[in-house]
Amino acid sequence: MSRPLTFLGIESSCDDTAAAVVRAEGTRAEILSSVVDGQTALHAAFGGVVPEIAARAHAERLDLCVERALEEAGLGLRDLDGIAVTAGPGLIGGVLSGVMLAKGLAAGTGLPLVGVNHLAGHALTPRLTDGLAFPYLMLLVSGGHCQFLIARGAEEFSRLGGSIDDAPGEAFDKTAKLLGLPQPGGPSVEAEAAAGDPRRFAFPRPMLDRPGCDMSFSGLKTALLRARDGLVAEKGGLTRADRADLCAGFQAAVVEVLAEKTRRALAVYAAEGAAEPALAVAGGVAANGPIRAALTRVAEAAGVRFLAPPLRLCTDNAAMIAWAGIERFRAGGRDGMELSARPRWPLDRSAPALIGSGRKGAKA
């Protein structure tokens, strides 16, 4: 069994400033602390994340989050075995703030520095929470990304498909903005949809008529916009029932697309011959109840185990970064002071680039 390792994790790739301390011994891990300082209030008036505001907030809050994480863990820097930091992909200003802080801490303490791919942090979360064995199928679904990945190792991922334009989380945020609902859009749309009729509006299910695991959500946003504008032109505005039905129809379309594409991805994954086949989901949109329920049914029908992280670990956090850093460190990965912030960093470097751009920039 490998020796126990205690890592500090730092995350600042979008609009959550986070720090955490994770201790791992073998396949068992313990989150000693996890501090997340969100920026929702700072961006609320703009209907989305403003990169300049996010970067400034990260620069102001990162050191405070690290201090809190160490204090809550009851540890000092001398008690750590390494420092892991998100080095991309993401909004470059925020990523740079985190990398610079991590470099300073590593230089001052002599601790190993490990740069972590933010997407790997999400993709490896099932190993942090459940000790899931490789290989497993991962659906990474968030505000900036949507990909099917076969995870074979800490740095070995094969992408089966993904969104060629907008990510589902971005589509949820846009839907909320179009309907005058609060941000972030995911929870707002889900809450409204609970009281709505998903059959009232016949929204498209993009790319279900095409083979493969690629997806598209931009046309779904356009269809919702047209439905909204039609109601406004007809009635002069939207009723509460209109909003609920629009949200329900939109959410049902997203759920159906993700479920069908997951079935196809599972068929490809079956060729891996995994001893303990599993489907895992991670990312902020993984907190959506109907999506979780649909994926659970798909996994059960395929005879594979389904795992979804606790809600607090679905959205951006530094515990997943600390864990991914430990995984990479165990595999021999570490970085020097030349570590750079990267706005784009694909997990599967051999896969062709996905078309389009989401909220976090070029698809990674």
Swiss-Prot record:
Its cofactor is Fe(2+). It is found in: Cytoplasm. Its EC number is 2.3.1.234. This is tRNA N6-adenosine threonylcarbamoyltransferase. One of its GO terms (cellular component) is cytoplasm. The gene is tsaD. The keyword Cytoplasm applies. Required for the formation of a threonylcarbamoyl group on adenosine at position 37 (t(6)A37) in tRNAs that read codons beginning with adenine. Is involved in the transfer of the threonylcarbamoyl moiety of threonylcarbamoyl-AMP (TC-AMP) to the N6 group of A37, together with TsaE and TsaB. TsaD likely plays a direct catalytic role in this reaction. Belongs to the KAE1 / TsaD family. GO terms for molecular function: iron ion binding; N(6)-L-threonylcarbamoyladenine synthase activity. Transmembrane segments: none annotated. Binds 1 Fe(2+) ion per subunit. Substrate binds at L140, V141, S142, G143, G144, D173, G186, N288. Keywords: Acyltransferase, Cytoplasm, Iron, Metal-binding, Transferase, tRNA processing. It comes from the Bacteria. It comes from Cereibacter sphaeroides (strain ATCC 17023 / DSM 158 / JCM 6121 / CCUG 31486 / LMG 2827 / NBRC 12203 / NCIMB 8253 / ATH 2.4.1.) (Rhodobacter sphaeroides). Fe cation binds at H118, H122, D316. Its main location: cytoplasm. One of its GO terms (biological process) is tRNA threonylcarbamoyladenosine modification. It catalyses: L-threonylcarbamoyladenylate + adenosine(37) in tRNA = N(6)-L-threonylcarbamoyladenosine(37) in tRNA + AMP + H(+).
